[in-house]
A protein has these predicted regions:
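Detector for C-terminal structural segments
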Residues: 219, 316-345, 383-393, 415-531
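Gly/Pro-rich hinge or "lid" segments in bacterial periplasmic/extracellular proteins
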Residues: 142, 153-159, 163-164, 170-237, ...
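C-terminal motif of bacterial Sec signal peptides marking the signal peptidase cleavage site
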Residues: 23-24
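Local pocket/hinge segments that shape ligand/substrate recognition
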Residues: 42, 129, 133, 264-354, ...
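A structural "hinge/loop" feature
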Residues: 43-60, 82-83, 109, 131, ...
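N-terminal lobe/hinge region of extracytoplasmic solute-binding protein
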Residues: 40-90, 206-209
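Short helix-initiation/N-cap motifs at beta->coil->alpha
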Residues: 243-255, 270-271, 406-416
């Protein structure tokens, strides 16, 4: 799952004006002082269609509108939600999910197994063009259907046996398949709603959901409003109304929080220089995340088609300096799988070594940076991304003699650029979609649409496929270690920079908010304190 953010000044002023009007007018929501619970998304969600969404902002909205077969507990193990139980059969090659009888959609209709079958086949349908279709490729004939090798979706190994029973047939035992059921792309969808409204099915007047909140309104580029679902089968949320603002400027978002006009901020709304002050405040936390930041190289473009150049740029970065700039609990990283996840290994990766970096660059034909072409590092518009980019720009100039041009882009434009024509160097990040190393390692598979470097390595692909089939953890770790060495030491299409923690602050008049290690903002247990 990718992480942003960015927006224009005029929208910022409009959002601020809207907030001031709402503060003066809205007193009927049942939360503290009758106000809605207000959070800042920071930007417009690119999509609320969970077959198409790819980013942190979109998934944080969807996670409060929808639930799926499972969610993960505090130990990152899948636990039933719409599924009341499941059976793992045929040595792990067949899984049968048994659904609850009381799970309903917001229009009162029962959630049935066919809603999952439709959703998963829509995710795989090549016409949908989902970037996350590959997550289901372990299902029999799923990849073949997605690639157009078969056209009959009845041949795909997922089927509703009846309203309460969903059968999944896998090509082979798959170690991460149950954790995958916590990921929003596997959540059910209503065929009648999607087919009736087409691309507009996620608009407030059309969408039907099954989670704790309903989509009340969506003023694009401005705000999203949610209201409690009174018929949510796990119980109505304590707060009646939620407002999700889209204030891009960190300083403005923090000012609104200080004035009581926002109730929760995360990293994307907290200026770095304000973190020491806020750390003394009630409600401030650093929440460890299963998330990493990296710089990627367009390996099909000169000069980064030369692995020596990629290694030189990697070894010229002093990652240990970056956490002191960001002040948010970050941890420098040379490997890709994050701390807290199976197969994390801090010993993997290229160390900071300027003399070796200069030697490699000289060997590649650019002694002391002479003759090196003008290249650009692109990043999405956000304060912390700029600070890191400027720091690393200085390291490359100092250690390699190369001045890299910086370019910042608004989030939607940046994502489109990565997909269509990646810059020579680009910033990106990844947060866990489901709590398994497969989710991190598979990002750079040759078939992954989010492999923006366009790098391919057949041995790497083989290793991640073997690890997915392996059910013994120690053997999985060895396979992932070898894959990480190829990624971070041998071919180096990316440079891991740091693993993140999320700086958050919650209005102390509220309790129950959950911001978990998967980067999800969970609001269904939020309530106003009574004292």
């Amino acid at each position: 799952m990718t992480f942003p953010l960015g927006k224009s000044f005029c929208r910022l002023i409009f959002s601020l004006f809207s907030l001031l009007v709402l503060v003066s007018c809205d007193r009927s929501s049942g939360t503290a002082d009758g106000k809605p619970f207000r959070v800042n998304l920071g930007t417009e969600p690119p999509s609320l269609d969970w077959s198409l969404a790819t980013d942190h902002v979109s998934f944080n909205v969807i996670a409060n509108l929808m639930v799926g077969l499972a969610e993960f507990d505090k130990n990152l193990k899948p636990t039933p939600v719409i599924a009341k139980s499941w059976d793992v059969l045929d040595s792990g090659k067949r899984i049968v999910f048994h659904l609850r009888e009381d799970a309903t959609w917001s229009d009162g209709k029962k959630v049935v197994a066919g809603d999952f079958e439709f959703s998963w086949k829509r995710l795989l349908d090549p016409k949908t063009a989902s970037e996350y279709a590959y997550t289901l490729f372990d299902i029999v004939n799923a990849e073949e259907y997605n690639h157009g090798k078969i056209t009959d979706d009845k041949e795909v190994g997922v089927a509703a046996l009846d309203d309460s029973t969903l059968e999944v047939r896998l090509k082979s035992p798959t170690s991460y398949f149950l954790p995958l059921m916590t990921f929003e792309v596997t959540f059910p969808q209503r065929r009648d709603v999607v087919e009736k409204h087409g691309s507009k099915w996620t608009e407030p007047d059309n969408i039907i959901t099954n989670g704790p909140f309903l989509l009340s309104s969506w003023k694009h580029e401005n705000e999203i409003r949610l209201k409690a679902n009174p018929n949510f089968f796990l119980g109505k949320p304590a707060i009646d109304n939620v407002e999700m603002m889209m204030v891009n400027e960190m300083t403005t978002a923090l000012a609104l929080y200080d004035q009581g006009q926002l109730d929760f901020l995360d990293n994307h709304s907290i200026p770095i220089l304000e973190k020491p002050r806020l750390a003394k405040s009630q409600g401030f936390k650093h929440v460890p995340q299963l998330r990493g930041e990296y710089y990627g190289f367009a390996v099909n473009k000169k000069p980064f088609d030369d692995v020596r150049v990629r290694k030189a740029f990697a070894m010229a970065i002093d990652r240990s300096f970056l956490p002191s700039l960001l002040r948010g609990g970050e941890q420098a990283a040379t490997s890709w799988i994050p701390p807290g996840m199976l197969a994390y290994n801090a010993k993997i990766g290229l160390p900071y070594n300027p003399p070796e970096a200069r030697r490699l660059l000289r060997e590649a034909g650019y002694p002391d940076g002479k003759g090196f072409p003008q290249v650009t590092l692109a990043y999405n518009t956000l304060e912390d991304k700029k600070i890191v980019a400027e720091a690393i720009q200085g390291m490359w100039k100092r250690n390699l003699g190369v001045l890299v041009r910086l370019e910042n882009l608004e989030w939607k434009v940046f994502l489109k650029r990565l997909l269509n024509d990646p810059p020579p160097i680009f910033r990106s990040g990844w947060g866990a979609d489901y709590p398994d190393p497969d989710n991190f390692i598979k990002l750079f598979a040759s078939y992954s649409p989010q492999n923006y470097s366009r790098w391919k390595n057949s041995r790497y692909d083989q290793l991640l496929e073997q690890a997915a089939r392996e059910m013994i953890e120690q053997k999985r770790v060895r396979l992932y270690n070898e894959a990480q060495r190829i990624l971070c030491e041998v071919d180096v299409p990316i440079v891991p920079l740091f693993n993140t923690a999320e700086s958050t602050i919650l209005n102390p008049r509220y309790t129950g908010l959950e911001y978990n290690s998967m980067g999800r903002l969970v609001l269904r247990n939020v309530k106003a304190k009574t004292d």
